[in-house]
């Protein structure tokens, strides 16, 4: 895929990149692309069930749809709903798991706090989705959560942290866009690059359906292998964790040291990480984009195929 200097052609991507505290893995286009790829790999029975459940239990119109509601595709529309409700429902921790940089592979439960984490949230929502006696609206919400959280899980910065709120406190100059402080946050920041800027620049203006087709063709030879690997959610987290170390943080100039693992509620907490890193003038230009884009492409494609695997498995006995 060519990576010329084409800037963000979608309003969603532009807004998310410069929204100071955005933590919305993959942004609108990325999440919708994951859903559209998944849709291609659902069994006929699962696809029919998903479409029927979502159609019969539409999103409550009271919710402000950040990415905009769409009637083009029910799964694509469902993919971003969890970000619309996270503030009011106060379930932000469901979207990520903070495994500190430098951690050794092992059980993930110690990193899942009292408010939950993405792996636990997927497991809990699958229980609801599989329950044939559960209320249809509850099952539809569970489905929307699962569609979104599997996408979140494949954004590397939703699987790790460096005492920096998953990269939100890492100011980065992206091509000609210099990092600036906004209250207690920074933009562009490392998290926003991976949510929107990197995949949007890579997509070169393609809409989610076009991007899904491109990635589907690009990884056609790999998909069967991914499917044969089976469902291993914890392994997928560690994949993202390793990619965060080798590419997300590892390809930045200058390098960012591993920080002591301390709780950070804002970028100006006691560790003052945002201001310290701002003075390092961290940059991500063409070289970084060339390293990062293939990783983002593969994670979005894997996320779609694996989401289909989870739904096919869950709905096989739930209908």
Give the role of each language-model region.
Residues 24-149, 156-319:
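N-terminal, motif-rich segments that launch catalysis or mediate targeting to/interaction with membranes
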Residues 16-17:
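Hydrophobic alpha-helical segments of integral membrane proteins
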Residues 1-12:
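Bacterial N-terminal signal peptides that target proteins for export
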Residues 20-22:
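N-terminal signal peptide c-region/cleavage motif recognized by signal peptidases
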């Amino acid at each position: 895929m060519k990576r010329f200097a084409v800037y963000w052609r979608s309003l969603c991507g532009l807004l998310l990149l410069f929204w100071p505290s955005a933590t919305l893995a993959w942004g609108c286009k990325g999440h919708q692309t994951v859903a559209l790829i998944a849709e291609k790999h659902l069994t006929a029975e699962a696809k029919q069930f998903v479409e029927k459940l979502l159609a019969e239990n539409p999103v409550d119109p009271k919710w402000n749809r950040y990415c905009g509601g769409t009637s083009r595709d029910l799964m694509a529309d469902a993919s971003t709903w969890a970000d619309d409700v996270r503030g009011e429902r106060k379930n932000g921790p469901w979207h990520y798991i903070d495994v500190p940089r430098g951690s050794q592979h092992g059980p993930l439960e110690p990193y899942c706090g009292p408010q939950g984490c993405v792996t636990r949230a997927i497991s809990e929502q699958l229980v609801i989705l599989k329950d044939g006696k559960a209320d249809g609206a509850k099952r539809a919400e569970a489905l929307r959560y699962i569609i979104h959280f599997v996408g979140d899980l494949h954004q590397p910065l939703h699987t790790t942290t460096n005492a920096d709120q998953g990269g939100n406190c890492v100011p980065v100059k992206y091509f000609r866009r210099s990092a600036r402080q906004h209250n207690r946050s920074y933009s562009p920041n490392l998290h926003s690059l991976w949510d929107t800027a990197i995949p949007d620049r890579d997509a070169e203006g393609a809409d989610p359906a076009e991007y899904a087709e491109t990635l589907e063709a690009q990884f056609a030879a790999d998909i069967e292998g991914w499917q044969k690997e089976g469902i291993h959610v914890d392994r997928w987290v560690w994949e993202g964790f390793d990619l965060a170390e080798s590419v997300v943080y590892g390809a930045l100039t200058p390098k960012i040291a591993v920080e002591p693992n301390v709780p950070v509620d804002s970028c100006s907490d006691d560790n003052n990480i945002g201001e310290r890193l701002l003075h390092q003038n961290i940059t991500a230009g063409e070289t970084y984009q060339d390293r990062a884009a293939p990783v983002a492409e593969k994670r979005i494609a894997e996320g779609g195929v694996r989401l289909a695997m989870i739904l096919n498995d869950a709905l096989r006995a739930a209908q």
